[in-house]
């Protein structure tokens, strides 16, 4: 049996880039909660002792940007300079302007267009992917890397591993078998965890705790064997972390946010963007389409692409590829997809309820992946039943 290795990585919520994603989405939540028609393009950057939010926001809401920044940093665990940032004493800079009137008239006619008339907020192409290798219909390499990162945060916050600090990265290499286009995971080849820690803990204690409290609860035993390689804090020291260790920017972890390197990516980031931005809403609807194709038994693995022009509601193109795993020809699946899903941005926002912010709805998406999550707020993960006739043998 011929196999191959494939690797996906993740970073947890204390990574500086992910901190920025979460702040941008916390701002989006606040805007949509007060004004569902808010137009938001919020970027964040951070470095030692400083966080800056900047971009274009038009909202009727009264937004306290500084409070959102400090609350988000504090909730992640950035409560002192020692851990990489002090939420209560760092500098917070704000440089927000209104959305360009040129864009506003072209996309939503200064809020006068009906939902079906709303144009895409920009050009671009987005991809959705699904695979039957996990119950989430997501790639296993990505699922495990993401769950390891989430577990690192869990054992830090609940006190199981008090030596942990907020910043950390994970990476999982899996040995796969290609079964006529479908991906079948055989075993975990390598697990890599690099996590920020305090001054007192030894490397032996780090390795032992990570195996016992992080890896064992996350990775099913059937995938581990005596040949599995573990790299646990291989650099030997990771005390300085968060924005003190590295600068952070919104939109720098787009593969972690999506499919861990599987499928494809059009390049557009998600966080800090309202649903007229098709980088986000377009990617969400094609994930729902791809997931529904696999869940309905039409294919074992599938990618869907959609593309847009600024100011134009209808997509320019929709593409489906089932990697040879389709039960009927791809062109017939494409027809079903076009009949079942409305790709116009204003209609995506309605069908997926994307104008509803608050309660950390979009903040939740900004760490540990936008897809494959079991949470009612992730409306794009709801499978849409697709009607099709099984071909007669």
UniProtKB/Swiss-Prot annotation:
Enzyme class: transferase
InterPro entries recorded: ADOMET_SYNTHASE_CS, S-AdoMet_synt_C, S-AdoMet_synt_central, S-AdoMet_synt_N, S-AdoMet_synthetase, S-AdoMet_synthetase_sfam
MF annotations from Gene Ontology: ATP binding; metal ion binding; methionine adenosyltransferase activity
UniProt KW keywords: ATP-binding, Cobalt, Cytoplasm, Magnesium, Metal-binding, Nucleotide-binding, One-carbon metabolism, Potassium, Transferase
NCBIfam families assigned: metK (TIGR01034)
Name of protein: S-adenosylmethionine synthase 3
Organism in which the protein naturally occurs: Actinidia chinensis var. chinensis (Chinese soft-hair kiwi)
Cofactor: how and how many bound: Binds 2 divalent ions per subunit. The metal ions interact primarily with the substrate. Can utilize magnesium, manganese or cobalt (in vitro).
Matching Pfam families: S-AdoMet_synt_C, S-AdoMet_synt_M, S-AdoMet_synt_N
Binding annotation for ATP: 167-169, 235-238, 246, 252-253, 269, 273, 277
A GO cellular component entry from the record: cytoplasm
Function field: Catalyzes the formation of S-adenosylmethionine from methionine and ATP. The reaction comprises two steps that are both catalyzed by the same enzyme: formation of S-adenosylmethionine (AdoMet) and triphosphate, and subsequent hydrolysis of the triphosphate.
List of residues binding L-methionine: 56, 99, 246, 277
């Amino acid at each position: 049996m011929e196999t191959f290795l494939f690797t996906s990585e993740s970073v947890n919520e204390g990574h500086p880039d992910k901190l920025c994603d979460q702040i941008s989405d916390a701002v989006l939540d606040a805007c949509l909660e007060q004004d569902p028609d808010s137009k938001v393009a919020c970027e964040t950057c951070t470095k030692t002792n400083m966080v800056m939010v900047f971009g274009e926001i038009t909202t009727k809401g009264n937004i306290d940007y500084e409070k959102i920044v400090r609350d988000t940093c504090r909730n992640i665990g950035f409560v002192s300079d020692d851990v990489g940032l002090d939420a209560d004493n760092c500098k917070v800079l704000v440089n927000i302007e209104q959305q360009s009137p040129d864009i506003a008239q072209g996309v939503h006619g200064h809020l006068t267009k009906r939902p079906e008339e709303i144009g895409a907020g920009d050009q671009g192409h987005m991809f959705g992917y699904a695979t039957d290798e996990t119950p989430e219909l997501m790639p296993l390499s990505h699922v495990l890397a993401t769950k390891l990162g989430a577990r690192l945060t869990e054992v830090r916050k609940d006190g199981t591993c008090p030596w942990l600090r907020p910043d950390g990265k994970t990476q999982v290499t899996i040995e796969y078998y290609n079964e006529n286009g479908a991906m079948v995971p055989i075993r975990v080849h390598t697990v890599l965890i690099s996590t920020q820690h305090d001054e007192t803990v030894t490397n032996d204690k780090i390795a032992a705790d990570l195996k016992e409290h992080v890896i064992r609860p996350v990775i099913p035993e059937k995938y581990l064997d005596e040949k599995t390689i573990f790299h646990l804090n291989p650099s030997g020291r990771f005390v300085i972390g968060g924005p003190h260790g590295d600068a952070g920017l919104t939109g720098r972890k787009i593969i972690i946010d999506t499919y861990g390197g599987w499928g494809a990516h059009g390049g557009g980031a998600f966080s800090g963007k309202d649903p007229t931005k098709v980088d986000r809403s377009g990617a969400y609807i094609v994930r729902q389409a791809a997931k529904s194709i696999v869940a309905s038994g039409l294919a074992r693995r599938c990618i869907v692409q959609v593309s847009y022009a600024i100011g134009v509601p209808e997509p320019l193109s929709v593409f489906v590829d089932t990697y040879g795993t389709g039960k009927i020809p791809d062109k017939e699946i494409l027809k079903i997809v076009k009949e079942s899903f409305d790709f116009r941005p204003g209609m995506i926002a309605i069908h997926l309820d994307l104008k509803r912010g608050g309660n950390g709805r979009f903040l939740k998406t900004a760490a540990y992946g936008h897809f494959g999550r079991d949470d009612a707020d992730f409306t794009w993960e709801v499978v849409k039943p697709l009607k099709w006739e099984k071909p007669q043998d």
